UniProtKB/Swiss-Prot annotation:
Keyword line: Autocatalytic cleavage, Cytoplasm, Hydrolase, Protease, Proteasome, Threonine protease, Zymogen
Official protein name in the record: Proteasome subunit beta
PANTHER family noted in UniProt: ATP-DEPENDENT PROTEASE SUBUNIT HSLV (PTHR32194:SF0), METALLOPROTEASE TLDD (PTHR32194)
Propeptide feature ranges: 1-53
Gene name linked to the record: prcB
Annotated catalysed reactions: Cleavage of peptide bonds with very broad specificity
UniProt GO molecular function: threonine-type endopeptidase activity
Metabolic or biological pathway, per its Swiss-Prot or TrEMBL entry: Protein degradation; proteasomal Pup-dependent pathway
Enzyme class: hydrolase
NCBIfam families in UniProt: 20S_bact_beta (TIGR03690)
Assembly behavior: The 20S proteasome core is composed of 14 alpha and 14 beta subunits that assemble into four stacked heptameric rings, resulting in a barrel-shaped structure. The two inner rings, each composed of seven catalytic beta subunits, are sandwiched by two outer rings, each composed of seven alpha subunits. The catalytic chamber with the active sites is on the inside of the barrel. Has a gated structure, the ends of the cylinder being occluded by the N-termini of the alpha-subunits. Is capped by the proteasome-associated ATPase, ARC.
Length: 280
C-alpha cells in the first residue's frame, strides 16, 4: 500500500499530524524532496550555467520603505533575460528582492509567501516583521548545500513594522548572507553584483526622512549608477520600455509603483545627466 493511501482518510500521517504553524516544517515532514535546498546538486561549480539575478536596492523614507530591482539576469558573460522580475510582495506588509541563482531564488520566494500565509491561517494573526525576517533566514540556511556549489540565494527583505514604537521609523530593511545570517540595515541597503556602485550612489542621495518621491528618485538613480559600472545590472531601457520593478510599503500595505511613474523618474535622471554632460 502506498504511503499516501495509508489510513482511512487516504492521506499520509504527515498530512494529518499538526507540525506547527510553519509550512516549511510541514513540507519537510510530508514531502522533503520539494524543499529547494534538499535536492542533490552536481559536485562541480554550476554558477556560470544558471541564470543569476543581479542588483536589488531598498531605501527607507518618512512613510515606509521602497525596494527596487533591475530587469537583467545573466548566465556567465551572456544576458539570459532582460525582463526578469526580482522584487515580490512577501505578504500585505513586506517585500522580498532576490539576487543569486534565479530559479532557486524564485522558488524560495514562492515557498516563503506560502509560509507567511500558512502561519496567518494557523495562528490567526500576522507574524511580526522580526519573525518574518527570521523565517526567511531559516530558509536561506536550508539552501547552504546548494550555495556551496555555486547556487547561492542572497535576498533583501523589507517591510512596514505594524508594531513600531511611537517616533520610530516604520520602514525596516534586512540583509542576509548565504549562511542565513540576517542583519538589519539603517536607511538603505543593496545586494547583488552592482550593490557596491548602488551603495556609493545612495551615500550621496539618501538622507533621513525623505519623502516618497525623493526616495523613489534616490532608488532609481542608485540602480542607474549600478548599471553604468556593472555589466550584469540592466539600466532603464526606453526602447523596450523596460524599467526597474519598484514596490512601496507603507501604512496602506505593499503596492507596486506603476511603470509610468518609474519611467518618468528615469527619464528625468537621463535628461539631467545629458544636459550636464553637454554643458561640460
Amino acid at each position: 500500500m502506498s504511503e499516501y493511501s495509508a489510513g482511512r482518510s487516504g492521506f499520509s500521517p504527515a498530512y494529518l499530524d499538526r507540525v506547527g504553524s510553519s509550512f516549511t516544517d510541514f513540507l519537510a515532514a510530508a514531502a522533503p524532496h520539494l524543499l529547494p535546498g534538499s535536492r542533490p546538486v552536481p559536485q562541480i561549480p554550476v554558477g556560470n550555467v544558471t541564470p543569476h539575478g543581479t542588483t536589488i536596492v531598498s531605501v527607507t523614507y518618512d512613510g515606509g520603505v521602497l525596494m527596487g530591482g533591475d530587469r537583467r539576469a545573466t548566465m556567465g558573460n551572456l544576458i539570459s533575460s532582460r525582463e526578469i522580475e526580482k522584487v515580490y510582495p512577501a505578504d500585505a506588509w513586506s517585500v522580498i528582492g532576490i539576487a543569486g541563482a534565479a530559479g532557486i531564488a524564485i522558488e524560495m520566494v514562492r515557498l516563503y509567501q506560502v509560509e507567511l500565509e500558512h502561519y496567518e491561517k494557523i495562528e490567526g494573526l500576522t507574524l511580526s516583521l522580526d519573525g518574518k525576517a527570521n523565517r526567511l533566514a531559516q530558509m536561506i540556511r536550508g539552501n547552504l548545500g546548494a550555495a556551496l556549489q555555486g547556487l547561492a540565494v542572497v535576498p533583501l527583505f523589507a517591510g512596514f513594522d505594524l508594531d513600531a514604537a511611537p517616533g520610530a521609523a516604520p520602514g525596516r530593511i534586512f540583509s542576509y548572507d548565504v549562511t542565513g545570517g540576517n542583519y538589519e540595515e539603517r536607511g538603505y541597503s543593496a545586494v547583488g553584483s552592482g550593490s557596491l556602485f548602488a551603495r556609493n550612489s545612495l551615500k550621496k542621495t539618501w538622507r533621513p526622512n525623505l519623502d516618497g518621491d525623493a526616495a523613489t528618485r534616490s532608488l532609481v538613480e542608485a540602480l542607474y549608477d549600478a548599471a553604468d559600472d556593472d555589466s550584469a545590472t540592466g539600466g532603464p531601457d526606453p526602447v523596450r520600455r523596460l524599467y526597474p520593478i519598484v514596490y512601496r510599503v507603507d501604512a496602506e500595505g505593499a503596492v507596486r509603483v506603476p511603470d509610468d511613474e518609474i519611467a518618468a523618474v528615469a527619464t528625468r535622471i537621463t535628461d539631467e545627466r545629458s544636459a550636464a554632460d553637454g554643458q561640460g
